[in-house]
């Protein structure tokens, strides 16, 4: 499979082989990461990477697009079926570009948007001051109730009434609970605002029927195609039919040029996989695993923000152990457990330090792990966090992680191609 790469560019081959080994031997617990199927990767590595196809299916600015049209049509129809959407654009290169296309298609510079605070679990592209969404538009931010650590819908309502936003944004990057999309729509309607939902983190769970679907409530729904959806890295936009032309012209030609047809092919494959019964079982297991992990961590003395999870992820408050997020990330990394430091609501620490870590179960579940494995992992996490500088304890945890990973190989068919185990 990789013979040409190995011969032509041994340096790149070496780096990729090492990454293959890292993925096989580490527990991937970053909530935004997952593993695609081999079929998805084969589509993305296909001859479609050679084809330019500016425009939309059957309305291209280049010849020779008859086969890429088939691929994009498949991606669109599968995506619409997956979420019950009226219209879909599968060309955005990322979730950020999908969000930009929605904003610019409906708003003018200086218009007000109402989104979730980044430090309370929102996303950069929902109006953070360091992002174009918070520079071009007048960004007002809602957050969490300090007692419940749930979205403060009373605050959303109050800010919406006070600032009269043109668009309200729902969705998050570090919020583990169910979002009440109907409530957001009710508030948006009362103040005459459009509603955009960024379901990037929850898309696979929504497709699997274990998390509420925002499509009936929002004029616009954006998503990435990786994370819980297990596709290639990319973005999509779903919308009501009346906004289709606005969205299409803002994706192309205003924000992007030629679509990445090899990535769109991989998206089509992933959407097809997500329509299966097996994927529904996968989504159910992701949530079961997350709850088992959270319960075990709490039993071991850690605090989970909001007291649990309804999704694939959770925020762990490390203050009971007097540990910082950056310390935890580094120590767990030595034990082959990959996590990311993350601010918790009302965090007193800097974003480069933090008082918490974010954990996810989507990738672990793709490997085939179940609740008992989550409890085993939780014990290793706590063991490391209580012994940050104890190399012996960290080595013991790493050995157990290696044993666990070997029981759930990712891509055994490709071991030889990547030189794994040689």
Curated annotation (Swiss-Prot):
Positions carrying N6-(pyridoxal phosphate)lysine: 227
Residues annotated as binding (6S)-5,6,7,8-tetrahydrofolate: 118, 122-124, 242
The reaction(s) this protein catalyses: (6R)-5,10-methylene-5,6,7,8-tetrahydrofolate + glycine + H2O = (6S)-5,6,7,8-tetrahydrofolate + L-serine
GO function term, MF aspect, one: pyridoxal phosphate binding
Keywords associated with the record: Amino-acid biosynthesis, Cytoplasm, One-carbon metabolism, Pyridoxal phosphate, Transferase
One Pfam family linked to the record: SHMT
Stretches of the chain forming a coiled coil according to its record: none
E.C. no: 2.1.2.1
Name this polypeptide is given: Serine hydroxymethyltransferase
Natural source organism: Sulfurihydrogenibium sp. (strain YO3AOP1)
Gene: glyA
